[in-house]
């Protein structure tokens, strides 16, 4: 079993520039990761007999250092955005880091340090909101994520239409390099 629980907090009060229309959001996240392994559910190679097949009564030499573990996990991030009204283009961008403390996994502690540690994951994203009218924007953006040797980059764009003061409709798509195309449809309801 794998269970995560996190609490996040963000500070949105950093405003600067002309009319205080440039904004910086700072965020932190802390939580726990809990893992539990039921060793009785595993089937090991030593339990297979080429003639009679699987026999759960066969002795095994495999064991875990621990079958249950809970560890602290910490993350943080920052986002900049230009909130200048009536501007033709407003830029935004951010970065976030997960597993900053590189939590250890005691269940596999007899392995090498690289296998025993959850690697740092970081995310970078940015884009520009091109305001075509007071109701319609087109928003191209890029997202890059990396954890250990795994990397993923997506490029996308969507159109946002302001229905009223409370609601925006969005439609667009993303291309994840060397992998997939993902359509996107969304609704943003404010003041719920």
Task: Annotate each PLM feature.
Residues 15-23, 83-91, 107, 132-137, ...:
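Short loop/turn motifs that connect adjacent beta-strands in outer-membrane beta-barrel proteins
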Residues 1-70, 169-192:
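Outer-membrane beta-barrel translocator/channel fold
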Residues 65-123:
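Hydrophobic, aromatic-enriched interface-forming segments
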Residues 38-45, 105-111, 153-155:
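Outer-membrane beta-barrel translocator domains and adjoining extracellular loop/strand segments
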Residues 1, 12, 29-33, 81, ...:
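Outer-membrane beta-barrel pore domains and translocons
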Residues 6-14, 76-80, 123-128, 155-160:
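Short, well-ordered amphipathic alpha-helices
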Residues 50-61, 103-108, 134-138, 162-166:
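Flexible, solvent-exposed coil segments and beta strand-coil junctions
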Residues 116-192:
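Outer membrane beta-barrel transmembrane domains
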């Amino acid at each position: 079993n794998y269970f995560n629980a996190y609490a996040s907090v963000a500070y949105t009060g950093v405003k600067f520039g002309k009319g205080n229309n440039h904004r910086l959001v700072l965020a932190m996240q802390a939580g726990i990761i809990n893992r539990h392994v039921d060793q009785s559910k595993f089937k090991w190679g030593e339990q297979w007999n080429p003639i009679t097949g699987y026999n759960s009564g066969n002795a095994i030499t495999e064991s875990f250092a621990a079958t249950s573990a809970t560890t602290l996990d910490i993350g943080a991030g920052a986002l900049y955005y230009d909130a200048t009204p009536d501007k033709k283009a407003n830029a935004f961008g951010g970065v976030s880091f997960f597993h900053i403390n590189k939590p250890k996994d005691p269940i596999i502690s007899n392995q090498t340090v690289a296998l025993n540690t959850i690697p740092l994951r970081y995310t970078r994203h940015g884009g520009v909101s091109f305001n075509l009218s007071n109701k319609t924007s087109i928003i191209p953006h890029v997202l890059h994520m990396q954890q250990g040797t795994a990397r993923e980059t997506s490029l996308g764009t969507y159109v946002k239409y302001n229905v009223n003061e409370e609601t925006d409709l969005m439609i667009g798509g993303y291309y994840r390099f060397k992998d997939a195309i993902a359509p996107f449809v969304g609704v943003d309801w404010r003041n719920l």
